[in-house]
Amino acid sequence: RTTHFWISIFCLVSMLPILGFLKNYKNIQNEEANIMSSKDEPSIKLSNNQLQIILMFAGVCCCVAMSMPQVHMVALCVDNGFGLQVGTEILAVMLYSGMISRIVFGFLSDKIGPLPTILLGSFLQMVSLVFFLPFNSQLSLYMVSLMFGLSQGGIVPAYAIIIRKYLPLQQAGVRVGLVLGATIVGMALGGWISGEIFDLTQSYYLAFVNG
């Protein structure tokens, strides 16, 4: 609780000046830049609203899977007898590696495009979740959590890139907000439903299967 408080103070102090800087940043985008940004991208035979709905649905689903280890890792470690500190360390490994993957997947999106990137990230996230099923030792949880973090961190940013490339620029703010809102719903739903599954089965096995 104290940590969250001081993080909030840091965000308040640091983000307000940054927002002031961005507010005065001149927008130099033009029609030619918009054409150049998307000329190498494959066309999508969907309406704007259809693509929006698909992205929101994908955002919910990917974050249901993403939230399961993040929300319940500490409890899983405590249940396995590793203790609270080990659970916190494993969660930190997962989140730090997720920070790295956000940057790496950003470079990857520039190279192969956001659609292949999001498919690759989702596939790797699924594979890493599968590895949680047979392994429950302390070392294996460190390794699988590292793998999971490296796979999932770049998924959500790819949604914003897809919107930038395939949907009207004038609507980008609203559309990105809707997709990110859907991912937050997915994170909440995934954490809750995994807890419900654990309460019913007294095991996280089916919770990982659900993810």
Predicted regions and their residues:
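C-terminal membrane-cytosol helix-exit motif in multi-pass small-molecule transporters
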Residues: 8-35
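A late C-terminal transmembrane helix in Major Facilitator Superfamily
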Residues: 166-203
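Structural signature of the two symmetry-related core transmembrane helices
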Residues: 116-131
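Juxtamembrane helix-start motifs in multi-pass secondary transporters
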Residues: 3, 114-120, 206
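Extracytoplasmic gate region of multi-pass secondary transporters
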Residues: 49-107, 114, 190
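Interfacial helix-cap and linker-helix signal at transmembrane-aqueous boundaries
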Residues: 1, 77-78, 108-109, 193-202
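Paired small-residue
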Residues: 128, 139-147
